[in-house]
């Protein structure tokens, strides 16, 4: 499967002898736990990217965010964490409606509201990771976040804000090399196909 092959590419770069949590964000955010010996011990996938797309384009919130996703130049850590914290207290649905209220009566800036909604959409993933029976993680687990900005940075900022994991790192592959291709190459090489 895709996330496992992508994970192999990331694992090749992080042979630390410590347990890892690989975070591969996208329309389906993928979380893969790896033990200290480098074996995958669990996977968790969410549809938070799809939920964010639906909220941004197909709900009453679409106007509040200008039907725009957060871009690198509009990324706002403060508003992201406000959305995250609000969703942690009141849930995704209520937080999204709060975004509309904020836009109408407090801050008529769609990029800020989009960051607020992004934080809310990602909150459930953090709860899932921390309480999952599928993943094996502890505060000593090194988190490696891949993907593209601003999503990569948003996840790093949220995990640092949450404070559970002691080490959070990012992984950016070389220009022009996809994680899937690199992982498939490594699998083929290990199995003597290449």
Residue spans of the language-model regions?
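Glycine-rich phosphate-binding loop plus the immediately following alpha-helix
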Residues: 1-21, 30-86
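Short glycine-aspartate micro-motif
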Residues: 20-24, 144
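Gly/Ser/Thr-rich loops at beta-strand to alpha-helix junctions
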Residues: 24-30, 148-152
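Short hydrophobic/aromatic-enriched beta-strand-loop microsegments
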Residues: 40-46, 163-172
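Adenine-nucleotide phosphate-binding core of ATP-dependent small-molecule kinases
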Residues: 85-128
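Phosphate/pyrophosphate-binding loops at sites that engage ATP/ADP/AMP, CoA/4′-phosphopantetheine
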Residues: 126-139
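Glycine-rich phosphate-binding loops at beta-strand->alpha-helix junctions
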Residues: 139-158
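Glycine-rich phosphate-binding/hydrolytic loop that grips phosphoryl groups
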Residues: 170-194
């Amino acid at each position: 499967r895709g996330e496992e092959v992508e994970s192999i590419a990331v694992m090749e770069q992080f042979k630390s002898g410590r347990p890892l949590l690989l975070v591969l964000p996208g329309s389906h955010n993928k979380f893969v736990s790896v033990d200290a010996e480098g074996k995958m011990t669990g996977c968790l996938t969410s549809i938070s990217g799809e939920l964010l797309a639906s909220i941004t384009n197909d709900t009453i919130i679409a106007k509040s965010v200008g039907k725009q996703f957060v871009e690198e130049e509009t990324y706002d850590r403060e508003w992201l964490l406000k959305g995250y914290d609000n969703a942690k207290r009141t849930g995704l649905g209520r937080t999204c409606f709060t975004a509309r209220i904020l836009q109408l009566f407090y801050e008529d800036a769609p990029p800020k509201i989009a960051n607020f909604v992004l934080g809310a959409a990602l909150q459930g993933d953090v709860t899932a990771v921390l309480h999952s029976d599928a993943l094996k993680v502890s505060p000593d687990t090194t988190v490696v976040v891949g993907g593209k900005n601003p999503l990569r940075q948003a996840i790093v900022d949220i995990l640092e804000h949450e404070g559970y994991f002691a080490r959070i790192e990012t992984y950016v592959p070389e220009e022009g090399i996809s994680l899937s291709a690199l992982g498939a190459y490594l699998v083929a090489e290990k199995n003597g196909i290449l």
